[in-house]
């Protein structure tokens, strides 16, 4: 399957996992023979992920999840090769991309510290071309000693490079979402992480935020980024991402209110609460808001 059955590259392929028994075998099979090191960093899977990784010849390291950026930075420290390719378990390297990676690393000058790779997102059984889902480039092929992930960005992580970045033409195949329920559930998780990040950054929502941000996102996804090209699916994705914006800012508002109460001891009195009657003890804190919303 690999072009010319070439020798493995001085490359570490790293996959972060949590309960990925369904996707991981296909991911690892797609990079067989590509890299000298295949590393799976697992954060506590209770399915067959670890067993399947080892059966495929991958090294497995266990590390408690402390955030995506933190997890990737820790994985970079474990890379034994000068180049690193980060993959998600539901991504696949095509033979064309395999050949291009080999050529790119063979020709990379000292000034190049990374490569952007386009992503072909497959959702609900089809390739999504509009709405910002294509080419959806990510900085995934990195020089191990010259790349770090910004710790303050937890969703859609940002890489800081000591050097220049070039681009590859052939895409990763991303088997992104197979059902609408799966898509909405993951966006809800991302909203919670983003809300926490907004609070840490000191960004408070204003009244116009709750209407303005979702409206802008809907227009951006469906019109500016031509989500209409994907028909009803494109409309669903645009509306869902607009809802994601609203959900994120509503969660941020709840976090800010909880933080303000915890720091000042001030209690919000519900409308109509009887005068002279003491409010019960509050039990709401940041962790409860995140879990229970």
Language-model features: where?
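N-proximal low-complexity "stem/linker" segments adjacent to membrane-targeting elements
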Residues: 1-30, 256-293
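Hydrophobic/aromatic residues located in beta-strands of well-ordered beta-sheets
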Residues: 13, 38-40, 165
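Acidic helix N-cap motif at the loop->helix transition within catalytic regions
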Residues: 22-25, 47-56, 96-97
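Short, structured coil segments at secondary-structure junctions
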Residues: 34, 55-57, 137, 161
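Conserved donor nucleotide-binding strand/loop of the catalytic core
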Residues: 36, 50-78
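Conserved sequence signature across two-component system core domains
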Residues: 41-43, 87, 288, 293
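Catalytic-site signature of metal-activated, phosphate-bearing donor transferases
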Residues: 69-77, 82-87, 94-259, 264-271
């Amino acid at each position: 399957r690999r072009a010319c059955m070439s020798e493995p590259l001085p490359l570490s392929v790293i996959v972060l996992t949590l309960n990925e028994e369904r996707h991981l075998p296909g991911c690892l099979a797609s990079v067989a023979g590509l890299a000298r090191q295949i590393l799976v960093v697992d954060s506590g899977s209770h399915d067959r992920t670890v067993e399947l990784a080892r059966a495929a010849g991958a090294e497995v390291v266990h590390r408690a999840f402390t955030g995506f950026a933190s997890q990737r930075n820790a994985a970079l420290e474990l890379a034994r090769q000068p180049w690193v390719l980060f993959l998600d378990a539901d991504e696949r390297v095509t033979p064309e991309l395999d050949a291009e990676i080999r050529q790119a690393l063979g020709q990379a000058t000292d000034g190049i510290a990374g490569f952007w790779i386009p992503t072909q997102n497959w959702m609900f059984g089809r390739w999504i071309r509009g709405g910002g889902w294509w080419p959806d480039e990510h900085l995934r092929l990195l020089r191990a000693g010259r790349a770090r992930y910004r710790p303050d960005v937890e969703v859609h992580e940002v890489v800081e490079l000591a050097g220049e970045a070039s681009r590859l033409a052939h895409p990763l195949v991303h088997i992104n979402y197979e059902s609408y329920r799966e898509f909405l559930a993951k966006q809800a998780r991302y909203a919670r992480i983003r809300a926490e990040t907004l609070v840490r950054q000191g960004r408070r929502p204003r009244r116009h935020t709750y209407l303005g941000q979702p409206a802008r996102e809907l227009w951006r996804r469906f019109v500016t980024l031509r989500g209409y090209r994907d028909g009803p699916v494109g409309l669903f994705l645009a509306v869902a991402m607009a809802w994601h914006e609203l959900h994120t800012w509503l969660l941020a508002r709840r976090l800010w209110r909880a933080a303000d109460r915890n720091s000042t001891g001030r209690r919000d009195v519900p409308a109509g609460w009887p005068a002279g009657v003491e409010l019960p003890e509050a039990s709401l804190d940041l962790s409860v808001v995140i879990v229970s919303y």
